[in-house]
From Swiss-Prot:
Terreic acid is a metabolite with antibiotic properties. Terreic acid also acts as a selective inhibitor of human Bruton's tyrosine kinase in mast cells and other immune cells. The gene is atG. Belongs to the cytochrome P450 family. It comes from Aspergillus terreus (strain NIH 2624 / FGSC A1156). This is Cytochrome P450 monooxygenase atG. Its cofactor is heme. Pathway: Secondary metabolite biosynthesis.
Length: 157
């Protein structure tokens, strides 16, 4: 999927990795019902629900070196297929969201249309204003941040 898409799609993919729609979301838990299991030194008894968290997966340094950096180029070249296994904002496996490709296409078209029709300039915005600091059910900037402020001018066509 990702290995054959243009740079703008890689930017979109980088964005949904670094700032997922719902970082607290996780896969539907599976229940360990076959045998007691040991995971990283922890005993996991039979009947224990097991799941994963999007945020912890997307910010795991073992999967994504420099996880806090927005780096669309990580989705280019060799190793891309391996990274795709850890990109889970749409879930994974048989229960993966069927709208994944549509969502990415909509993001790319929206951004392209926005930049084609408008000139955008950051206004009184620093990196501190956009670093995600609060995570519960949605991605949010820090409580002191006014968010991203932008001056918008219509482009003459």
């Amino acid at each position: 999927m990702i290995s054959s898409v243009p740079y703008r799609e890689r930017q979109s993919i980088g964005g949904i990795r670094s700032c997922p729609h719902s970082p607290a979301s996780s896969r539907f838990p599976r229940v360990n019902d076959s045998a007691p299991t040991v995971f990283q030194g922890w005993d996991v008894p039979i009947g224990t629900p097991i799941s994963m968290n999007i945020w912890n997966t997307h910010y795991n340094k073992d999967f994504f070196p420099g996880p806090t950096e927005f780096w669309p180029e990580r989705w280019m070249g060799e190793g891309t297929r391996e990274l795709e296994k850890y990109l889970v904002p749409f879930g994974s496996g048989s229960r993966m969201c069927t709208g994944q490709n549509l969502s990415i296409a909509e993001q790319v078209l929206t951004i392209a249309t926005l930049f084609r029709n408008y000139e955008l300039e950051l206004y009184q915005t620093t990196k501190k204003n956009v670093v995600m600091a609060s995570y519960c059910m949605i991605s949010l900037p820090g409580s002191e941040s006014p968010g991203i402020q932008v001056k918008v001018r219509k482009t003459v066509q």
